[in-house]
Design a protein with these regions (language model features):
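N-terminal, post-signal peptide beta-strand-biased segments of exported outer-membrane/organellar beta-barrel
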Residues: 18-125, 254, 406-408
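Single-residue recognition of alpha-helix boundary sites
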Residues: 13-14, 65, 189, 253
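Sec-dependent N-terminal signal peptides
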Residues: 4-14
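Short, Lys/Arg-enriched, disordered terminal segments
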Residues: 1-5, 483-484
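Outer-membrane beta-barrel porins/channels
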Residues: 21-30, 34-35, 105-484
């Protein structure tokens, strides 16, 4: 049993979290105009994407329309710097083409003044993170009795994460009174998640110095695919009187309709001498988990938006509260044997190594925006919104591991213009995003490698900054627009 206690400490070190996956609720705004206006659709009708933001505002639409929205592309840069010249500086850049959106809101024939229907298909999450690094150096890692002189150290790290979530929404709105409208939206979410993380390091002896140990190495490799179908409901209210608009939206927690996935994990330790042991041993752990039933949760949320119209200006502000989600198990490995060869004793450690868990903290995101009408066919738009991360850390850290997350708050600055035609409207804009965390733990390191840390190096803390620029474009076609 002592052998497994030693391995628990070693293997949990290999599964230390690296943060790179999405954990923001509002990185992608639905609809180009709403993205530029930073959530103004909470309080008043902006475009046919109202079915997603606040279905009740569809009753204020003056025309029926179909919107085709897409970002032309986004460039993200992430850099870590501990400020001490130690460890590894992480520099990664990625150019992405984001999926588009199609949405429509339509009057229900002769009941147009009482009811409206909205539909939409859009990308709710689109996040790809790729990173690879390698280090080769001459370093004295192993004691000189077994490996005289310095060893050749080779370390490699690879991370590849892809998260895509596509949502289909259908909503209905009705007028309750002169000033009040109500709406409801049903959303079906299809979420696909791919994750691969590999770390391997080797300390190779100089054969000319007659070592008693030729090589010491460690490697961890974990890969998983997780798929979900979720259902989420929204209820909304809209109030309009004179130049003022108010919107309230309550979103229920997501309900799982289907989930599936698989995971393959492997750890190899070669000629490792664990702490408090005088003997070297090699260890091997491997498991393939299939037909998994993973879990994924979205919390309850409450949104409130307000806007006021002036002669040629509309000012909007809004906020959304997201509830917390207590720690839950995303992937339960069951009784699969991980440590090899399998025994009755080592099965109890599988859950500690391979269990994936998540926990979301409560937060509030806010936004402000302005739209300035230059003339009946042209307007300028700009806005600012916060996009706080929802990762929550539990002390002491439970065994198992979290999927990687971007643990920095983001702030989005938007600007653009709207050009209206007789039966259409074009919107062009740009979004600049900035995120930063000043007490961020370096996710991996090749410096300070030793047997006590399984050749992984010592991870320091420093500042991480993420900057991105995204182009935004959309086309709106009016089905029946009143003559101006």
């Amino acid at each position: 049993m002592k052998r497994f206690v030693l391995l628990t400490g070693c293997f949990c070190t290999l599964f230390a979290p690296l943060y790179g996956q999405d954990n923001h609720y509002e990185s992608l705004q639905l609809g180009s105009k709403n993205a530029l206006l930073s959530g103004a659709a909470l309080s008043h009708w902006v475009d046919p994407t109202a079915v997603v933001h606040n279905a009740a505002t569809m009753m204020d639409a003056k025309e029926a329309g179909i919107a085709f929205n897409s970002t032309t592309g986004g460039f993200d840069n992430i850099r870590f710097d501990n400020g001490l010249g130690e460890g590894v500086d992480i520099k990664t850049s990625d150019f992405q083409l984001y999926p588009g959106l199609i949405a429509a809101d339509l009057p229900l024939f002769k009941q147009a003044n009482k009811y409206r229907l909205g539909i939409a298909i859009f990308a709710r999450v689109s996040d790809r993170t790729r990173f690879t690094n390698r280090s080769t150096r001459i370093q004295n890692i192993i004691n000189d009795v077994e490996m005289p002189g310095s060893e050749t150290y080779i370390g490699q790290y690879t991370l590849d994460i892809d998260v895509r979530e596509t949502t289909a929404a259908m909503g209905w709105a009705t007028r309750l009174s002169e000033h009040w409208s109500a709406g409801v939206t049903a959303m079906t979410l299809i979420r696909n998640q791919r994750y691969r993380e590999n770390f391997n390091a080797n300390a190779i002896a100089d054969p000319t110095l007659s070592p008693t140990v030729d090589v010491v190495s460690s490697e961890s490799d974990i890969s998983m695919k997780l798929n979900y179908i979720l259902l989420q409901m929204k209820g909304s209210l809209a109030w309009k009187k004179g130049p003022w608009n108010l919107g309230i939206v309550l979103t229920a927690p997501a309900m799982k309709m289907y989930s599936g996935g698989d995971m393959i994990a492997q750890i190899e330790l070669t000629n490792i001498r664990p702490v408090d042991s005088l003997n070297r041993r090699s260890y091997f752990a491997s498991a393939y988990l299939e037909k998994l039933k993973p879990k994924f949760k979205y919390p309850v949320s409450l949104s409130v938006g307000v806007s006021r119209s002036f002669d040629d200006l509309v000012l909007s502000a809004g906020g959304t509260f997201y509830g917390n989600i207590d720690r839950y198990v995303v992937v339960d490995p069951g009784n699969t044997s991980f440590l090899q060869p399998p025994t009755e004793d080592n099965i109890i450690f599988t859950q500690r190594f391979l269990e994936v868990w998540a926990s979301n903290r409560p937060l509030v995101n806010t936004s402000i925006s302005a739209e300035w009408m230059l003339n009946p066919r042209t307007s300028l738009m700009g806005g600012l919104r916060t996009d706080l991360h929802y990762a929550e850390f539990i002390e002491p850290v439970p065994l198992g591991f979290q999927l990687p997350k971007k643990i920095w708050n983001r702030y989005h600055f938007n600007a653009g213009a709207s050009l209206n035609g007789a039966r259409s409207r074009w919107i062009f804009g740009v979004q600049y995003s900035h995120g930063q965390a000043d007490d961020y733990r370096q996710p991996y390191s090749f410096d300070g490698a030793s047997e006590s840390n399984l050749l992984q190096g010592e991870r320091s803390k420093g500042s991480i900054r993420a900057n991105g620029v995204t182009g935004i474009v959309s086309f709106l076609f009016y089905v029946n627009r009143p003559t101006e």
